[in-house]
């Protein structure tokens, strides 16, 4: 299937409709950028586990109706694999950990989607973040002790501990430093702060090396991602969350994000199953809850004990009244 409309392309865009591939390039005094986009039709070797529910195992259906249902509920898996490359020089004033660099933006994604046919473009709803390779290169001579710290975070997450995707510490004394982060998750294209999902923060520790306005280093990064019509379209390779290139092992180290320890110590819990709940996405209204109790919770046990004590007090009071009245 040809995913791209037949129209004239700009001079800086290489378009190969036969292979369903597009290459975008841009270069000026501010830096260089290059983007590659490939359709799923060229990558048939991608395998995944289908999320399916066999209707025949639920309902007794005539053969003809079964065939019609299969056709009606079939869905084409649209996947566009993209590789984005950018290079930019960094002012030493901006290398103090006070600012962030968005590695993927809504504007960039919309530019990629605009090249697709309308019937394909309207189905795209997710972006899957596969890998980010980051190369730092000094704009000064080798041999100067220049420690640097880098962190890639999902700045949509409020917790500073949980927002970390990967962090690395190295030294530009040898001229360059490189590492790779594998986010391996998908997000909706309609998420409010998409531009903050891949935020790069860099802290150049030798802040007195140059003055404000001097370019201290070059950041070159490659982002591999996929645009799809489903959250279930992509499987990721089983890489670590962050890797340091072998040649840089002696001058740097990395810190990957932690996976939380889940403890199954809460066997008694409740869930609100009240009627007339608000529709997902609609304005919520206050309503009286109706909790379904699972197990015997501590709060439930405390309530029962309290009621028992109240009942005993009532019985004692009743007996006292009988004594006073001479009954």
Curated annotation (Swiss-Prot):
Biological processes annotated in GO: transport of virus in host, cell to cell
Subcellular location(s) per record: Host cell junction, Host plasmodesma
Pfam families recorded: MP
A GO CC term assigned to this protein in UniProt: host cell plasmodesma
Residue stretches spanning the membrane: none
InterPro entries in alphabetical order: Caulimoviridae_Movement, Viral_movement
Electron transport as UniProt keyword: no
Cell membrane recorded as keyword: no
Coiled-coil stretches noted in the UniProt entry, renumbered to this chain: 297-327
Keyword annotations from UniProtKB, A to Z: Coiled coil, Host cell junction, Host-virus interaction, Transport, Viral movement protein
Function: Transports viral genome to neighboring plant cells directly through plasmosdesmata, without any budding. The movement protein allows efficient cell to cell propagation, by bypassing the host cell wall barrier. Acts by forming tubules structures that increase the size exclusion limit (SEL) of plasmodesmata, thereby allowing viral ribonucleocapsids to spread directly to neighboring cells.
Similarity annotation: Belongs to the caulimoviridae movement protein family.
Subunit structure: Homotrimer, through the coiled-coil domain. Interacts with VAP. May interact (via N-terminus) with host prenylated Rab acceptor protein 1D (PRA1D).
Protein's recorded name: Movement protein
Species of provenance: Cauliflower mosaic virus (strain NY8153) (CaMV)
Lineage: Viruses, Riboviria, Pararnavirae, Artverviricota, Revtraviricetes
């Amino acid at each position: 299937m040809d995913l791209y409309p037949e129209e004239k392309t700009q001079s800086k865009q290489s378009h190969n409709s036969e292979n369903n591939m597009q290459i975008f390039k841009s270069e000026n005094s501010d830096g260089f950028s290059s983007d590659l986009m490939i359709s799923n039709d060229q990558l048939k070797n991608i395998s995944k586990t289908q999320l399916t529910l066999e209707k025949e195992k639920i309902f007794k259906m005539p053969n003809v109706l079964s065939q019609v249902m299969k056709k009606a509920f079939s869905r084409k898996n649209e996947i566009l694999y993209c590789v984005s490359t950018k290079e930019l020089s960094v002012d030493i004033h901006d290398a103090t950990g006070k600012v962030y660099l968005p590695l993927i933006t809504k504007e960039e994604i919309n530019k990629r989607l605009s090249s697709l046919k309308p019937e394909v473009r309207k189905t795209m709803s997710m972006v899957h973040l596969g890998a980010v390779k980051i190369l730092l290169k000094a704009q000064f001579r080798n041999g100067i002790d220049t420690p640097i710290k880098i962190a890639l975070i999902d700045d949509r997450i409020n917790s500073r501990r949980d927002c970390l995707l990967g962090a690395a510490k190295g030294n530009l004394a040898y001229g360059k430093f490189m590492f790779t982060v594998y986010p391996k998750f998908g997000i909706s294209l309609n998420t409010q702060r998409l531009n903050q999902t891949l935020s790069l923060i860099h802290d150049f520790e030798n802040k007195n090396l140059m003055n404000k306005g001097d370019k201290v280093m070059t950041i070159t990064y490659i982002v591999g991602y996929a645009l799809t019509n489903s959250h279930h379209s992509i499987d990721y390779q089983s890489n670590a969350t962050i890797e340091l290139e072998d040649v840089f092992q002696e001058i740097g180290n990395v810190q990957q994000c932690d996976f939380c320890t889940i403890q199954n110590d809460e066997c008694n819990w409740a869930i609100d199953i009240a009627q007339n709940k608000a529709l997902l996405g609609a304005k919520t209204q206050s309503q009286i809850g109706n909790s379904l109790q699972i197990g015997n919770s501590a709060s439930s046990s405390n309530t029962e004990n309290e009621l028992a004590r109240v009942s005993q007090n009532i019985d004692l009071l009743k007996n006292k009244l009988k004594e006073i009245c001479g009954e």
